[in-house]
From Swiss-Prot:
Family to which the UniProt record says this protein belongs: Belongs to the ABC transporter superfamily. Lipoprotein translocase (TC 3.A.1.125) family.
Name recorded for this polypeptide: Lipoprotein-releasing system ATP-binding protein LolD
PANTHER family xref list: IMPORT ATP-BINDING PROTEIN (PTHR24220), LIPOPROTEIN-RELEASING SYSTEM ATP-BINDING PROTEIN LOLD (PTHR24220:SF689)
Gene name linked to the record: lolD
CDD domains the record matches: ABC_MJ0796_LolCDE_FtsE
SUPFAM superfamilies noted in UniProt: P-loop containing nucleoside triphosphate hydrolases
Length: 224
């Protein structure tokens, strides 16, 4: 049976500040299975990014559960949660978040080094993946020397270098022109097939979203 690699049950999230009390998520249920490609669409402020942060273990829900590879995140301390997150998930954002003082190779190798891999193994794996995403001749360049599309390709390589089970992508092409966005999406689809990794993508682009296996819509903190 294809068990979920990432799941949330009855997920609620409230933000309270002074007299302000806003419930952003209202009992969200979601399962992501191995190799599945899901897109979530919705207006700004509908709760999409909040959901991704909770699924990624980057924030804690007000109530409900997040299960990562079958493990309840609430049962883990911060160190164990970070270890599980590093092993199970990859992250891609609208802005690449590559570190400007490091080369592209060093940026992509970093998750493996954080996970305890040797420098040689981390560099070899990063170089191989950078070649796969078309950046084999750019590995010693700094992020500032790359185009927007190249930086996002490097960010995708960084997300996949640990061979995660699922990649969470928040508007991964939102900062790119339409042609480059199409190329980046095509790359993600190819890597989904090659590595069997799941993709959960938040996007405003309907044409790109419909390349996924399933498109979900978020309205006022609920998946509909």
């Amino acid at each position: 049976m294809n068990e979920p690699v990432l799941e949330c049950r009855a997920l609620h999230k409230r933000f309270v500040q002074g007299i302000l009390d806003v419930e952003v998520l209202h009992g969200v249920d979601l399962r992501i299975r191995r190799g599945q490609r899901l897109a979530i669409m919705g207006a700004s402020g509908s709760g999409k990014s909040t959901l991704l942060h909770l699924l990624g273990g980057l924030d804690t829900p007000t109530s409900g559960k997040v299960l990562m590879d079958g493990i309840d995140l609430a049962a883990l301390n911060e160190r164990r949660r970070a270890e599980l997150r590093n092993k199970t998930l990859g992250f891609v954002y609208q802005f690449h978040h590559l570190l400007g003082e490091f080369t592209v190779l060093e940026n992509v190798a970093m998750p493996l080094l954080i996970g305890g891999a040797s420098v040689a193994r981390a560099r070899d794996a990063a170089a191989a993946l950078l070649r796969r995403v078309g950046l084999g001749k750019r590995i010693e360049h700094k992020p500032g020397e790359l185009s927007g599309g190249e930086r996002q390709r490097a960010a995708i390589a960084r997300a996949l270098v640990t061979r995660p089970k699922c990649v969470l992508a928040d508007e991964p092409t939102g900062n790119l022109d339409s042609k480059t966005a199409e190329q980046v999406y095509q790359l993600m689809l190819e890597l989904n097939q090659e590595f069997g990794v799941s993709f959960l993508i938040v996007t405003h682009d309907a044409s790109l979203a419909h390349k996924m296996d399933e498109v979900l819509h978020m309205e006022d903190g609920r998946l509909v």
